[in-house]
């Protein structure tokens, strides 16, 4: 049962070796630093050694050769460490995938939550930010608030009209205006109508609805 994967890995390694042979050692220099392997480091070492040998046997070339070898050893160590870290991450990823699959198989009650329906929800009673009112209750509260706000605006406009003198102040029960109320009822009715019209105009002007 395990032979096919081994054969596939061998085939992949064979393909990589063929590609490396076709490209040659120079192909290692064109790779990204994150894609380098130990074989690529060996190819780079071969290229640099060949170039140094072409320079001759000058003592300075020999000293430079030792430095280049040291740098290549450091590069090889970094590449090997990166490869090991990558393999560890892949193994951890596969392990986590298996754990997630196992948890999904062991937790079928999650399907029960879907059966609540589109118009239902689960509320945590210990959550201080949980919803405490229904949507209809909030709508009623907002409607009542807007109604009271409009009434307050009317009262404020009427008070402003009294203060500015647009509406004359009313006298008390013992005043002359109340004594002559029967005689001047028609005038008062017309005046009250005019006062309401002024208040209405002022209110609509404040609301941006002047007629």
UniProtKB/Swiss-Prot annotation:
GO terms, biological process: cilium assembly; epithelial cell morphogenesis; protein transport from ciliary membrane to plasma membrane
Keywords: Cell projection, Cilium, Coiled coil, Cytoplasm, Cytoskeleton, Phosphoprotein, Protein transport, Transport
GO CC annotations, alphabetized: centrosome; ciliary basal body; cilium; cytoplasm; cytosol; intracellular membrane-bounded organelle; membrane
One Pfam family from the record: RILP
Boundaries of every RH1 domain copy: 24-106
Domain RH2: 130-201
The protein's role, per its UniProt record: Involved in cell shape and neuronal morphogenesis, positively regulating the establishment and maintenance of dendritic spines. Plays a role in cellular protein transport, including protein transport away from primary cilia. May function via activation of RAC1 and PAK1.
Protein name: RILP-like protein 2
Protein source organism: Homo sapiens (Human)
Gene name tied to this protein: RILPL2
């Amino acid at each position: 049962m395990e032979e096919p994967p081994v054969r596939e890995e061998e085939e992949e390694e064979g393909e990589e070796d063929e590609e490396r042979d076709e490209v040659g050692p120079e192909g290692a220099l064109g790779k990204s630093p994150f894609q380098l392997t130990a074989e690529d480091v060996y190819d780079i070492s071969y290229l640099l050694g060949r170039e140094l040998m072409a320079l001759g046997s000058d003592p300075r070339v020999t000293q430079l050769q030792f430095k280049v070898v040291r740098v290549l050893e450091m590069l090889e160590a970094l590449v090997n460490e990166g490869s090991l870290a990558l393999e560890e991450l892949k193994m951890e990823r596969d392990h986590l995938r298996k754990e997630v699959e196992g948890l999904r198989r062991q937790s079928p009650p999650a399907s029960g939550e879907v059966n609540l329906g589109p118009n239902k929800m689960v509320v945590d009673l210990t959550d201080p930010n949980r919803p405490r009112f229904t949507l209809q209750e909030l709508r009623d509260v907002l409607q009542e608030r807007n109604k009271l706000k409009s009434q307050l605006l009317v009262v404020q406009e009427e008070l402003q009209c009294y203060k500015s003198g647009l509406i004359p102040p009313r006298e008390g029960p013992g005043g002359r205006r109340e004594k002559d109320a029967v005689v001047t009822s028609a005038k008062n009715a017309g005046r009250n109508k005019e006062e309401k019209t002024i208040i209405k105009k002022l209110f609509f002007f404040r609301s941006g609805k002047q007629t």
